[in-house]
Curated annotation (Swiss-Prot):
ATP binds at residues 34-41. This is Chromosome partition protein MukB. Gene3D superfamilies: 1.10.287.1490, 1.20.58.850, 3.40.1140.10, Immunoglobulin FC, subunit C, MukB, hinge domain. Belongs to the SMC family. MukB subfamily. It holds the Pfam family SbcC_Walker_B. Residues 666-783 are annotated as: Flexible hinge. It comes from the Bacteria. The keyword Flavoprotein does not apply. PANTHER family: CHROMOSOME PARTITION PROTEIN MUKB, DUF4476 DOMAIN-CONTAINING PROTEIN. It comes from Shigella boydii serotype 4 (strain Sb227). It is found in: Cytoplasm, Nucleoid. The hinge domain, which separates the large intramolecular coiled coil regions, allows the homodimerization, forming a V-shaped homodimer. Plays a central role in chromosome condensation, segregation and cell cycle progression. Functions as a homodimer, which is essential for chromosome partition. Involved in negative DNA supercoiling in vivo, and by this means organize and compact chromosomes. May achieve or facilitate chromosome segregation by condensation DNA from both sides of a centrally located replisome during cell division. GO terms for biological process: cell division; chromosome condensation; chromosome segregation; DNA replication. The gene is mukB.
Length: 1486
């Protein structure tokens, strides 16, 4: 079961006496107990303000001025607030267990008006742990707190996750949220709804029976049913529109003949004049255009001649300028040839000198070799002389040393002395002072090893020395060669530079070998380049003459084209005469054909207009007569189909109307006889009992009762038996069920519910299986849903029926139009367009005339073209052989490349010529540069040192060997003293000395002779070097002179220079010849221009005269055209068939129409004046003004609510169709209105019965309510007798009063009011209009009378009035009425709110001390039974046993007024429990 929403607490912030107070509200009764001024009313006022924050309604009477005669500015709220921000908040929990805090922010507005500013807000998603006071206050310290403004509260809540804060700008939005969330019972859409809610709360607050509520119980308890009123208002509007439309159609129909006549004559009058002016303008324009064409042609010829003159003058100027350039180029070419010849002679001298230098170079090299050999012989002689000197010196020393004796003693003495001397020498040489003869053998081995090592080292150095001696002279020679080639450089760089020079020499020799091939290639390419330049010049000249640039790929095709053109031009010139004759013959044939077509054109145009109208009407395109006849057959078939479909739709619409009428019966009875039987049997229809069943439950109950769903429920079946005897006026099957209609339930059957079906056990041996119907009709909601769908279907069917009716009539009229068309125009309409053919023939005629007039010019142009083509072919014959050259874009680049390569090769040749011999000499000896020759002296010193070391080692070893060999001689010490004399050895030494001296003399003489010869060789070498240097210097001077000349003096240079000179001479001759030709042509062109200028002046004079005539009429014609286009009448006036009539015929036609129009507009002053003004022939635009005025007059007469078009012609065509269709629609709606007069009575009666049942159910909840002597309270609902009579007449006797409902002057509401007056003539209606009375009669609430009755003591049921009841009884009775109103609102709003929400119920009761304990207990019981919360205020002597009681005591503490609150929950035997958070210490807002 859905739990009902509850108010959890009320929070007051900064109210008078309450700074921050939260009252937890009991689920039933919350009592505010306290003395006067304790704050009970303030608390209730805060609750009401949060519930209804509408300052226009809030009025707390117990705080306003008593006895005041004028309205109080303070309605009780301003004085209950303290300065600053105030809050009143309601904490609620709804049926969905959602916590919602709603409230208002209040603030006093400064001023004498004592106004209060109110801002409502709502908070959703707030956790249960957060108290309302925590939200709106901020604790500053233990004794102080601050109230947060609304914007800070918003920021604080937005920072909390899941919490939503909403501020409302309107009370309607605030109450809408409260209704959707189940806080209030009714949706308060307007100020009137809020006023009712406030009056309810106010009546609850102050107690008693509220006259404001009891007087308007119908507004509180009965919901407004505006459906009937709105339906009949819509019906009245539709009927009013239909009647106005019908009247407008009749008026339009009466004007139809006038429309036709006025349109026809106005069109003839204006269109004839319009087309006549158009024809005249076309003729004048044709003449002007012809003159302009001739003028344009002459101007073109003159412009062509001028262009030709300018072109030839420019070409002549170009040739004059080119002649000077060519003369300068020719002179430069001649000078260049002379320079080339001079350079060639200079080159021959250079070659002779180079040959001489080569010869001197060879002789110089040979002399160098001779000098080198002489130097070698000189060195040999010096060595020999030096050796002879050494030998003489050695022999002399030997002769002095060896003079011993020849005997043994002398020998032993000598050997002993020699041994001693050898030992001493060995000591000295070996630096061994302790050396003895015995130890000499040991030391000998050591020094022999040293000697061997020194010898090996000396031999190695000797080998190096030998090689170094050989490389020494080569290095110097190679170094000098490198210096000669490269210039001065360091000796250590010679090797790297030499290798680089050799590599460069190889490259330079390779390049030098290419000089001659490159010269030949360059000569060839330069020749091709000159030819290419010449070809480009020829091509540029050709393109300039042709007036178009050509690609070289197009030249061959152009050549063929020009040759073909030459052939074709030669043929065309020969065929010109025959062509001229053929053109004249064709021109005559065209003239006769055009005349015949102009006679046929008007008939064809009339047929086409008729065909276009038919095509527009049917939306089809017809291309043949067969298409027309086939479409006519389709129209017939379509008409039959549309009639059949219209009849079917009409039948279905009638069936829907019948079903709607049947379902609209009160109580859901589909048979009127059942209502009468129910009243006769004293029962109630079962469908009425279940009239309030929901749409979801309708299928179940419909299947549950099955065929008995139309049964009658009677209290006692036995009492019905006598009525059944002889009953005939009843349905075929009549079901009767015994039961209490006031407390009927579905327990009469045993039911098993299946899926979408039920099994009903009617008896032990009889079951019924019924499925849920797809379209249930059981219950008001189901019937209303079905009626709504049927109404929608009926609207669709009505619209479809009207559309089909219109289509049928339109098809019939279209069929008639097709029949007329077939009879009148079918024979000619599908022939070819004569106007199109005329245009083609006229175009061809103009072409023929132009061809004939320009034939001679064409022949002349062809001859000119022939000459130009021949000239072009001649030029192309010179260009085509050079196409390859023109296509070679890289030729100039290749010439530059070859020239650069030739320059490099020539430079290389000069390098080779200058340094070739040095490089050749350097190449075989370059390897000697790897080692520095300056190391030779060091090597020489090393060799000398090694040699000395080897000699020293050898001497040491020899000395030790000698000591070892002479070990035996040391024993000849006794012979040492012996002397020896001379011997033969001395003689031999002397002989050898003489021979050595003689050899020395010979060597010295030879040395002197070779020295003189070497001096001669050096003199010859110096002479050769001087001659070589002189020749070399002369060669360098010649080469510089050749470079200064700046001409490449190769073998073909002279030939190229001569060819270039001859070519320039030929170009100069051609240029002079062309210049002479241009001078002659220019003279002839000037004469032709003079002739064209004279002809042009005459043509301009003729053209301007004709143009002046056209311009004179243009202003009026432009005004006419602008007026025609702006008013969209061109289609009406531009009748092409009139274009073939003569000006006299058109003028006659216009005059006849003018006479008819004068009679037609005689009664219309405006059109008559406009027609009179349009007769001026000089102002054709005034005729258009008349036509526009006539159309505007007709357009204003068209009712736009009937015919949706601005075209009067179309309006005439639609009148008949629209008239019949709308007449039928009006008839249908009137028939519907007759049916609706019965339906409205049924709906009102059904609604009354439903509300009576609902009030009856409400009364059941108040049966046990008692207050004092009042035992029960109930509501009586009765139908007024006058209104019940009206319902009877509407449902049963409406045919007797059809004069009211069929009247075109009365609406349905007015007819209903007249009927009411007719039935109740005694009632005075006052000043109210019938329309107002009729609208009131459509509201079912005006049919009912409601009053509250109480069952009081022995008096029984009495009308509840305050004068007849005690105060407590009045309070209890009033509270009962309010509870009934709240419950009624909930029932009414249940369909508007979610089904899972049961709204909060809360009422107030101030000054409850006027009730006794029994009444208080009754209130508690009522609250518990209805799940209602109640807040009551009572003095301190009231102590209820249930609910929650708050004791309020107002105190003053330190000039601060506050209310002390203590909360108690009931009075049980246990000790009272103080509610948490109710004891409040005084606090002051910061």
């Amino acid at each position: 079961m859905i739990e009902r929403g509850k108010f959890r607490s009320l929070t007051l912030i900064n109210w008078n006496g309450f700074f921050a107070r939260t009252f937890d509200l009991d689920e039933l009764v919350t009592t505010l107990s306290g003395g006067n001024g304790a704050g009970k009313s303030t608390t209730m006022a805060a609750f009401v303000t949060a519930l209804i924050p509408d300052l226009t309604l809030l009025h707390f009477r117990n705080t306003t001025e008593a006895g005041a005669t004028s309205g109080s500015r303070d309605k009780g709220l301003h004085g209950k607030l303290k300065a600053g921000v105030c809050y009143s908040m309601l904490d609620t929990i709804n049926s969905r267990h959602q916590r919602v805090v709603v409230g208002v922010r209040l603030q006093q507005v400064a001023g004498r008006d004592r106004k209060v500013d109110i801002k409502p807000f709502a908070i959703q998603g707030l956790p249960m742990s957060v108290q309302p006071t925590q939200l709106v206050t901020e604790t500053l310290n233990e004794r102080q707190a601050r109230v947060l403004p609304l914007n800070e509260l918003k920021d604080k809540l937005e920072a909390m996750e899941g919490v939503q804060f909403k501020q409302f700008n309107s009370i309607t939005d605030y109450h809408s949220l409260m209704f959707d969330l189940g806080i209030i019972a009714r949706r308060l859409r307007s100020a009137s709804d809020r006023s009712k809610f406030y009056r309810l709360i106010e009546a609850s607050l102050y107690g008693g029976i509220s006259s404001a509520i009891t007087r308007s119980l119908r507004d509180y308890l009965l919901p407004e049913n505006s459906g009937v009123r709105k339906a009949f208002q819509d019906m009245e509007a539709a009927l009013r529109e239909n009647r106005m439309t019908l009247e407008a159609i009749r008026v339009t129909q009466s004007d139809r003949d006038l429309f036709k006549h006025l349109i026809s004559e106005a069109t003839n009058y204006v269109a004839a004049d319009y087309m006549r002016h158009a024809n005249e303008r076309r003729v004048h324009l044709d003449k002007a255009l012809e003159f302009r064409r001739e003028l344009h042609t002459s101007r073109q010829q003159l412009a062509a001649e001028q262009y030709k003159h300018v072109d030839m003058a420019r070409e002549l100027a170009e040739h004059n300028g080119a002649e000077g350039d060519l003369e300068a180029d020719y002179q430069a070419a001649s000078d260049h040839l002379n320079l080339v010849q001079t350079a060639l002679r200079q080159q021959e001298k250079i070659e002779r000198y180079e040959a001489d230098l080569d010869e001197l170079q060879i002789r110089l090299e040979e002399q160098n070799e001779v000098v080198a050999e002489a130097i070698e012989r000189q060195e040999e002689n010096e060595a020999r002389a030096e050796a002879a000197e050494l030998e003489v010196d050695e022999l002399k020393s030997q002769l002095a040393d060896y003079q011993q004796a020849l005997d043994v003693q002398q020998t032993r003495a000598i050997q002993y002395n020699q041994a001693i001397a050898a030992l001493n020498r060995a000591k000295e040489l070996c630096h061994l002072p302790d050396l003895t003869a015995d130890s000499a053998a040991e030391w000998l081995e050591t020094f022999q090893a040293k000697e061997l090592e020194a010898t090996e080292k000396m031999l190695s150095l000797e080998q190096k020395m030998s090689m170094a001696q050989t490389a020494h002279s080569q290095f110097e020679q190679a170094y000098q060669l490198v210096v000669a080639i490269n210039g001065p450089l360091a000796r250590n760089e010679a090797w790297d530079v030499a290798r680089e020079l050799l590599r460069e020499g190889v490259d330079q020799r390779h390049l030098a070998e290419q000089v001659q091939p490159l010269r030949m290639r360059l000569s060839e390419l330069e020749q091709r380049l000159r030819e290419q330049q010449e070809a480009e010049r020829l091509l540029a000249d050709f393109c300039k003459r042709q007036g178009k640039n050509f690609d070289i790929d197009e030249l061959e095709a152009l050549h063929q084209e020009l040759e073909a053109r030459i052939a074709s031009l030669s043929d065309s010139v020969s065929n010109a005469r025959e062509e001229r004759m053929a053109l004249r013959q064709e021109q005559e044939q065209l003239q006769s054909r055009i005349q015949s077509l102009m006679q046929r054109a008007p008939v064809w145009l009339a047929a086409q207009n008729s065909l276009n109208q038919l095509s527009e009407q049917c939306g089809e395109e017809f291309t043949s007569s067969q298409d027309v006849t086939e479409y006519l057959q389709q129209l017939l078939e379509r008409e039959r189909e549309a009639i059949v479909e219209r009849d079917e739709v009409g039948a279905r619409k009638n069936a829907v109307d019948e079903e709607i009428e049947r379902l609209s019966q009160p109580g859901g009875s589909e048979d009127q006889r059942l209502n009468a039987l129910a009243e006769r049997f004293g029962g109630v229809l079962l469908s009425e009992i279940y009239d309030d069943v929901s749409l979801e439950d309708a299928p179940y109950f419909s299947a549950l009762y099955g065929p008995s769903r139309h049964a009658i429920v009677v209290p006692d079946l036995s009492q019905v038996t006598e009525h059944l005897d002889g009953l005939t006026d009843c349905p075929e099957d009549l079901y009767l069920i015994e039961g209490d209609p006031q407390s009927f339930d579905d327990s009469v059957f045993s039911v098993d519910e299946l899926e979408k079906a039920v099994v009903v056990k009617i008896a032990d041996r009889q079951w019924r299986y019924s499925r849920f119907p797809e379209v249930p009709l059981f219950g008001r909601a189901a019937r209303e849903s079905r009626i709504e769908s049927l109404h929608a279907e009926r609207e669709v069917l009505s619209e479809r029926f009207a559309t089909l009716s219109f289509d049928v009539q339109k098809t019939q009229r279209l069929h008639q139009a097709f029949s007329r068309f077939i009879g009148s125009h079918l024979a000619v309409v599908f022939e070819s367009d004569p106007e199109a053919e005329i245009r083609q023939l006229n175009s061809r005629r103009v072409e023929l005339e132009r061809a004939l007039s320009n034939h001679e010019n064409d022949n002349q142009q062809q001859r000119i073209q022939f000459e130009q083509a021949k000239e072009g072919v001649t030029a192309l014959n010179r260009i085509l052989p050079r196409l390859n050259l023109l296509a070679d874009d890289s030729l100039a680049d290749r010439v530059d490349e070859i020239r650069e390569r030739l320059d490099e090769a020539q430079e290389a040749a000069r390098f080779v010529q200058q340094f070739g011999n040095q490089l050749a000499k350097l190449e075989p000896i370059v390897s000697v540069l790897q080692s520095d020759p300056e190391q030779f002296e060091q090597l020489k010193e090393d060799y000398a040192y090694s040699q000395q070391m080897q000699r020293d080692a050898r001497q040491q070893a020899f000395a030790l060997t000698e000591v070892v060999q002479r070990r035996a001689h040391f024993s000849y010490s006794d012979s040492a003293e012996m002397l020896s004399g001379n011997s033969d050895l001395n003689e031999k030494l002397r002989e050898r000395l003489e021979q050595a001296e003689a050899e020395r003399t010979r060597a010295r003489e030879a040395l002197r002779g070779h020295a003189a010869q070497l001096s001669q060789y050096n003199q010859v070498l110096a002479s050769l070097k001087s001659s070589y240097d002189t020749k070399k210097e002369l060669l360098n001077d010649l080469q510089r002179e050749l470079q200064d000349i700046g001409v490449c003096a190769d073998s073909g240079a002279e030939e190229r220079a001569r060819i270039r000179r001859d070519e320039l001479h030929a170009q100069l001759s051609n240029n002079r010849s062309r210049r002479n030709q241009l001078e002659k042509a220019l003279t002839f062109c000037e004469a032709e221009m003079d002739n064209l200028t004279r002809k042009l002046r005459k043509l301009e004079r003729d053209y301007f005269e004709m143009r002046e005539q056209v311009v004179t009429a243009k202003a009026g014609w432009c005004a006419v055209m602008r007026m025609v286009k702006d008013n969209g009448v061109e289609r009406r006036l531009h009748r092409r068939e009139l274009a073939y009539l003569s000006a006299d015929d058109l003028r006659s036609m216009s005059d006849k129409a003018l006479g008819a129009l004068r009679l037609a507009v005689a009664d219309n002053e405006h059109l008559r004046d406009v027609l009179r003004m349009s007769e001026d022939p000089k102002r054709p635009e005034r005729k258009i003004q008349f036509f526009v005025a006539a159309y505007q007059h007709l357009r204003e007469r068209i009712r736009q609510d009937i015919i949706r078009t601005d075209d009067p012609v179309e309006a005439i065509e639609q009148m008949e169709i629209e008239l019949s269709r709308l007449t039928e629609e009006l008839t249908s709606r009137e028939q519907k209105l007759v049916i609706s007069s019965r339906s409205v009575a049924n709906i009102i009666r059904k609604t009354i019965q439903r509300e009576q049942n609902r009030i009856r159910m409400l009364n059941q909840g108040l049966q046990n309510v008692s207050f004092g002597q009042v035992n029960s309270v109930r509501l009586n609902v009765n139908v007024r007798e006058t209104h019940a009579m009206l319902l009877d007449v509407l449902s049963e006797q409406h045919e007797q009063h059809q004069d009211l409902f069929n009247s075109n002057r009365l609406t349905f509401s007015e007819a209903l009011a007249k009927l009411y007056q007719r039935l109740n003539p005694q009632i005075d209606m006052g000043q109210r209009t019938p329309q107002t009375i009729g609208e009131e009669l459509l509201d079912y609430r005006n049919y009912l009378e409601m009053e509250v009755e109480v069952n009081r003591g022995s008096d029984g049921w009495l009308r509840a009035e305050s004068g007849a009841l005690s105060t407590g009884e009045a309070i209890g009775t009033g509270m009962s009425i309010l509870v009934m109103v709240v419950q009624s609102w909930e029932d009414e709003s249940r369909r508007l709110r979610g089904k899972d929400i049961s709204p909060c119920r809360l009422l107030f009761l101030d000054e409850a001390a006027r009730l006794d304990a029994r009444s208080i207990a009754t209130l508690f019981e009522l609250c518990e039974r209805l799940q209602m919360q109640l807040i009551i205020a009572a003095p301190e002597n009231i102590s209820p046993e249930k609910g929650t009681t708050y004791k309020l005591v107002r105190k003053v503490f330190q000039n601060t007024e506050h209310v002390h609150v203590v909360g108690l929950r009931g009075f049980a035997p246990q000790l009272p429990e103080t509610l948490p958070g109710t004891d409040e210490a005084p606090s002051q807002a910061s």
